[in-house]
Amino acid sequence: MIGKTRHAVPLAPATFAQGCGVLRHSPPPGAYRHTRYAPAGALADWVQHFWVESWDLRGAAPQIRDVLPHPCVHLAFVRGRTRIYGVHLGHFVRELKGAECVFGVKFRPGVFYPFLGKPVGSIANVSFPAQQLFSNITAVEEELLSSPDVHRMVEVASRFLLAHLPPRDPIVEQACGAVETIAKDPSVTRVDSLLALCGMRERTLQRMFRRYVGASPRWVIKRYRLYEALEQLDHGKPANLAALAQNLGYYDQAHFINDFKKLIGRSPAQYVKA
C-alpha cells in the first residue's frame, strides 16, 4: 500500500515495493535495491524499520526518484555524511547517480522528541549532521558501513540505538497512537473526528503533534487519505474523482486535486495517464 509501510521481516529482506514511498510512475530504477528489516525487542517501540538502499549507476544516466513524504524522522548512514532528516512536508525528488549504499533508521511517528530534546516540528524539511545529536556517531558510522553484511549492520545500529534510548515519555505513546489511528481508520478525515477518538482538546492535540510528530494533525490526516487515493487510482478505481474526493473528506473536487498536485507533483488525471 502506498504511504503505509509493510511489515518488515527480522533480518530477511523485504522486496522493494511501492510501499517504500516511491511513486509507481518514477523512471525505471536500474541497478537499484531497497530492503527493510524489522527491529527486535525494545527497539520495536522506537523504530519502524531499518532500511538499506543501494544502487550502481556508474556509466549510466542518473535516475530521478519521486518520493512521498511520511510523518517520520530518519537517521541515514552514509560514509562521511551521516545525517538526521526531519519530516518532509511536501513532494520531493531525489537524484541517484554513481554507486552508493545507504543504511537508514526510520523512527516511528511521534517518538523522536525525547531524542531531539526540542519540538520535532523545528526540524521539518531540514537535515543536519547526526554528530550534532550523537557525539560518537563517526565511530558507529565506520563500524556499520564496514560491516560484511546487512545482518551485522543491523546489529551495530541496534546496539547503538539501545545505548542511546531516552527515558520513557508517556506522551510518546499518545502521539504514536494518534498517528496510528489516522493511518488505520479511513473515516478520520478531519481534525474534529481525531479529537473525538483521542479525547483531547484541539490546542493540546496541535501542540502534541508539533512537538512529537513534526507536522500538524491536519497535514498527517491529509497525507494518509491521499495515500489511499493513490492506492485506489493505482487499482483503477474509482473513475469518479468527485466521489473519491468526497469519500476522503473533501468538500469539493477542486481542493482534492490541489492537495493531490502538491503531494504528487501532478493532477490525478495526469497521474493515471502517465
Which stretches of residues belong to each language-model region?
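Alpha-helical bundle regulatory/interaction domains
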Residues: 1-192, 197-202, 215-216, 231-235, ...
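DNA major-groove recognition helices of helix-turn-helix
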Residues: 205, 212, 229
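DNA major-groove recognition helix of helix-turn-helix
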Residues: 209, 221, 259-261, 272
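A secondary-structure capping/hinge motif
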Residues: 212-215, 259-267
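Contiguous, well-ordered alpha-helical segments that form the cores/surfaces of helical PPI scaffolds
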Residues: 227-231, 258
